[in-house]
Amino acid sequence: LVDGKLTRHIGVSNFSIEAIEKLNDGARIRPEMNQIEIHPYMQQDRLVDYCRDTGLLVTAYSPLGSRGNRVLKDPVVVAVAQKHDCTPAQAVLAWLMARDIVVIPKSVHEQRLRENFEATDVALDEDDMRRMASIERHERMSDGSFALFEDGPYTVYDLWGAE
């Protein structure tokens, strides 16, 4: 695809460290981006660090969580937002961007789209960053089961590995 000029960059999604290593061992052209679920309850520090160390950029999907937005109601997130006079969503997005993670929050509402963009104006300090890091739960909002077929050859472990 790159050689045929059909694309300039290659990215992967939901690749674990093991999957990235396996891909890179045989790849002539390495991917430049790994899109993974990241939010305050699923921070994936080990995978993010590995991606950085190997030159992969990281994109966070579901950066605000999902399923009723429990992440946005977390007392730590709310407190950080209040401290900066911003919304909880803006606080979470600012936290991710401060970690040099690309964010792709989903919204179809114009006001929320504006608010999400305005998160670029929120500057968190070291204490805020530590507080946000403290609420890690290793809790996926998307387990990937939607991509599996009942009689298919793959399991959720095949998708995520040991990560």
Question: What is the predicted function of each stretch?
Answer:
Residues 1-163:
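Beta/alpha (TIM)-barrel catalytic core signal, keyed to glycine-rich beta->alpha loops juxtaposed to Asp/Glu
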